[in-house]
Amino acid sequence: MEIDQRGHLIIGGCDTVKLAEEFGTPLYVFDEQSIRDTCRAYKNEFESRYDRVKILYASKAFMTKAMAALIDQEGLYVDVCSQGEIYTCLQAGVKADKLYFHGNNKTEADVRFAFEVGIGRFMVDNEMELELLDRVAGELGEKAHIIMRLTPGIEAHTHDYIKTGQIDSKFGMVICNGAAMRAVKHALGLENVVLHGFHCHIGSQIFDIEPYNEAVKVMLEFANEVKKETGWNIEQLDLGGGLGIKYNDQDKPKPITQLADVVTGAVKRYAAELSMELPELLLEPGRSMVGEWGTTLYTIGGVKEIPGVRKYVSVDGGMTDNPRVALYQAQYDAVIANKADRQPEETVTVAGKACESGDMLLYNIDLPKIDKGDILAVFSTGAYNYSMASNYNRHQRPAVVFVKNGKARFIVKRESLEDLVRNDVIPGDFDDK
């Protein structure tokens, strides 16, 4: 954290107090250079240890046209899971063959749209999707190039809502009960489907890297069984993302270097033990790419103290720009941006402005003495905040700026009141008769 001589918080060379004045609050602020540095770290750490690697940015973490363009400039591919994410990438100039299309319930419209634009890979989640892809590909005279998502039965120690690798999951085909093998044989028998590899994702916000080692073991052993039964060789192994980040002082995330050591070492070791050719290795970082490099600025309004109980501080945002506290009991660190050099003087709970008792941002956080009009900076809001923002209570979604070398640039304009009603319609014959 950088603080100038006035005690103001500085991000990307920009005074956050001035950012709040210029762009208004709530405001999402992203440190562009740090995002680029993280992209390069993922590429460098994995490519220096393994010959064939693709890094796919998990766009659900944070996606705008500018973000898509940045990812493309840094030489990464993109993990997408909707027509909207695909369209955003295309509008930013990303080539469709660099997009890998996820999703557990792709509709026929989704599939046709993906074929139309020339999607790179379909990440297949179930056997019904195989049938859909084969049929539509046949009608269009195309081939569906796929990677199958499998459930390896790995228990990652994280929040229940962001575990995905255990057997009881809505995602993927289970290996241990035979469902995955049946699906593979099904895929190999389809005329218009080309199977390239397997994918798994064991969860998010993971601090213990050992489950990645186990995931590699399970996935390659399964690939070896498939080879024995069908003669098919795995070309691509996608191990998803999930590396945790620091939200507060209790979080101890592992560095990218350690993840690269464990993953590449495991792939080489188990492939050698099984006498398999090394597959191309794919990773899908999202949160760890952008999470720590986003900060949300708020203006403090009312203060309410209940003696002997709690002191509430209200801000001009809340669950409409950050629903993760309500969804996951997420915890954050924060400072008063215009008093960033001062020591804490009081313990407060920061409440959002939505008409909802559960709209809280920070519980029992120690901050300097707070005055109306102060600017609150909440850290590590780069992932799944803008992405999950809503118009609840008809609040406008905030603006987003990239900051770099002392310069701030809009990448998303603040929504206007006109934007809120742009798609609303009152039918011409709408009356009580």
Model-found features: residue ranges?
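Short acidic, glycine/serine/threonine-rich loops at helix termini
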Residues: A68, Q91, V111-E116, L133-V136, ...
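Active-site-proximal loop/turn and secondary-structure-junction residues that shape catalytic pockets
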Residues: A61-M63, G84, N105-T107, N126-M128, ...
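Charged (often Lys/Glu-rich) extended helix/loop segments that serve as interaction or gating elements
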Residues: V262, A272, M276-K433
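Active-site loop/helix belt of alpha/beta enzymes
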Residues: G153-G302, L367, N393-H395, K404
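Short beta-strand segments
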Residues: A58, H145-T151, H199-H201, D238-G240, ...
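A charged N-terminal "starter" segment
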Residues: M1-H145, M181, K185, G189-L190, ...
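Hydrophobic face of alpha-helices
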Residues: R36-C39, V216, A260, A377
